[in-house]
């Protein structure tokens, strides 16, 4: 046989192939076409919104992301949170708040002030926090509603900060979790991780919100020299928050008390017969450090 030819290129092969396909049922040809088209269609539709976002907010390089404004960051984060991954953003935010109760200085203050000492006050505290954060993340940074929610939050914190009952590091840690947890949850549980554009938007937005709330990032390695972009801040605050947990997320009875009250809030709409399942799921979502700090069994 010549080097340039084989059975697969001969007329007899073409005739054989046609004969095989001609004898196949029509549904089989349709199924083969569907199997080929389906992944292409899924790829096109799944990434359609991300491609539109990257076209609308054109930051082609990491260097160009340094010019991202707070308003652009807000719009990018809003589209991603409300249209692309709405369920995971909500759950990540809830878990971020829950995770702060693993730090004794935070849980002690909540119990001491009565905010998490009984169901009535724990529901109010959770609702107030959700409302304020919702106003901040769902409205433009230049809007009246965002201004009022920031001002209200600063007022609520001011007395505790003046008396030293709220630590600046605890505030930065809480801010870090609200920025980092959605990124981590989506990377772990969704069909794709966030893009650099989306991560930069989240970092830019929460760094700016922290500044507005009077939460300093100076303790971070680049805090005094400045951050290149939102991704730079996000990565540094993520690393810092993990190191903070190693030092300060330790077992404490009031961590457990705060966690129990928070869990009761989260399971409120679930029928009581399913509460044990909800508790097991909550425990499953915890890593070993958080589980030990809250005195939950493995």
From Swiss-Prot:
Its main location: endoplasmic reticulum. Disruption phenotype: Results in dramatic reduction in MPA production. One of its GO terms (cellular component) is endoplasmic reticulum membrane. It catalyses: 4-farnesyl-3,5-dihydroxy-6-methylphthalide + AH2 + 2 O2 = (4E,8E)-10-(4,6-dihydroxy-7-methyl-3-oxo-1,3-dihydro-2-benzofuran-5-yl)-4,8-dimethyldeca-4,8-dienoate + acetone + A + H2O + H(+). It is found in: Endoplasmic reticulum membrane. Residues 46-298 are cytoplasmic. It is a single-pass membrane protein. Its EC number is 1.-.-.-. The chain crosses the membrane at residues 25-45. Belongs to the mpaB oxygenase family. ER-bound oxygenase; part of the gene cluster that mediates the biosynthesis of mycophenolic acid (MPA), the first isolated antibiotic natural product in the world obtained from a culture of Penicillium brevicompactum in 1893. MpaB catalyzes the oxidative cleavage the C19-C20 double bond in farnesyl-DHMP (FDHMP) to yield FDHMP-3C via a mycophenolic aldehyde intermediate. The first step of the pathway is the synthesis of 5-methylorsellinic acid (5MOA) by the cytosolic polyketide synthase mpaC. This is ER-bound oxygenase mpaB. It comes from Penicillium roqueforti (strain FM164).
């Amino acid at each position: 046989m010549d080097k340039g030819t084989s059975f697969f290129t001969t007329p007899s092969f073409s005739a054989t192939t046609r004969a095989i396909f001609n004898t196949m049922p029509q549904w089989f040809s349709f199924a083969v076409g569907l199997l080929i088209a389906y992944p292409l269609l899924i790829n096109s539709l799944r990434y359609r919104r991300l491609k539109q976002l990257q076209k609308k907010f054109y930051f082609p390089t990491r260097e160009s992301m340094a010019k991202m404004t707070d308003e652009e960051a807000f719009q990018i984060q809003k589209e991603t949170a409300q249209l692309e991954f709405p369920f995971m953003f909500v759950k990540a935010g809830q878990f971020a708040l829950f995770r702060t109760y693993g730090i004794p200085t935070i849980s002690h203050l909540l119990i001491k002030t009565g905010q998490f000492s009984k169901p009535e006050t724990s529901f109010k505290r959770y609702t107030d926090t959700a409302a304020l954060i919702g106003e901040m993340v769902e409205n433009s940074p230049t809007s009246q509603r965002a201004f009022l929610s920031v001002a209200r939050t600063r007022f609520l914190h001011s007395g505790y900060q003046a008396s030293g009952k709220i630590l600046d590091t605890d505030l930065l840690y809480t801010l870090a979790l609200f920025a980092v947890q959605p990124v981590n949850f989506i990377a772990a549980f969704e069909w794709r991780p966030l893009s650099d554009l989306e991560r930069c938007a989240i970092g830019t937005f929460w760094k700016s919100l922290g500044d507005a709330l009077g939460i300093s990032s100076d303790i971070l390695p680049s805090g005094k020299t400045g951050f290149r972009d939102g991704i730079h801040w996000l990565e540094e605050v993520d690393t810092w928050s993990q190191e903070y947990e190693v030092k300060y997320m330790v077992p404490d009875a009031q961590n457990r008390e705060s966690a129990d009250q928070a869990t009761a809030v989260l399971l409120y709409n679930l029928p009581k017969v399913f509460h044990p399942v909800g508790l097991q799921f909550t425990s499953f979502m915890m890593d070993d450090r958080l589980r030990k700090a809250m005195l939950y069994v493995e």
